[in-house]
A protein has these predicted regions:
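Soluble, non-membrane globular domain cores that form compact, hydrophobic packing
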Residues: 1-69, 75-147
């Protein structure tokens, strides 16, 4: 997805997690699942649902993750998409934010993946549009302002 962005649409970004091998500058990076609490802290993905995924990646705004955070999660069972999406939405909507307040949350389903993106409305909308363009079978499960 990030490679499809025009230069004028890009922002300072990084991907990955706390493991140096997974950290990427200006690109998405792998997120390890061995520590569910890290997945929750980095991506606002509920710890209890980490057992339902077998791979994850992230892309975040380098200056402030609340400006843009995206997580892509491969579900072990695609039938869990609806319940995991609901859990993600509930978690994000009830989070106590620091250092900026994100405008919008989108949770989408693409094949066996769940994609969560929150942050500045313009950045989130751009990502949503590029996701739908790249993957026409994308289903927007929820699209909500964060209040």
């Amino acid at each position: 997805m990030w490679a499809k962005y025009a230069e004028e649409d890009k922002f300072p970004a990084a991907g990955g997690d706390y493991d140096e091998a997974n950290m990427k500058d200006d690109a998405p990076g792998k997120v390890g699942l061995a520590k569910p609490e890290d997945v929750e802290y980095l991506l606002s993905f509920p710890q209890a649902d980490v057992e339902k995924i077998d791979d994850a990646a992230s892309l975040m705004h380098m200056m402030n993750a609340n400006t843009f955070t995206c997580g892509a999660f491969r579900l072990k069972d695609a039938a869990d998409a609806e319940s995991v999406a609901a859990d993600v939405k509930e978690y994000v909507m009830n989070k106590q934010w620091m250092c900026g307040f994100p405008d919008k949350l989108i949770v989408a389903s693409v094949g066996g993946y769940l994609v969560e993106v929150f942050g500045d409305e313009e950045l989130v909308n751009t990502f949503r549009d590029k996701l739908a363009e790249a993957y026409p079978d994308t289903v927007i499960v929820s699209e909500d302002p964060i209040v």
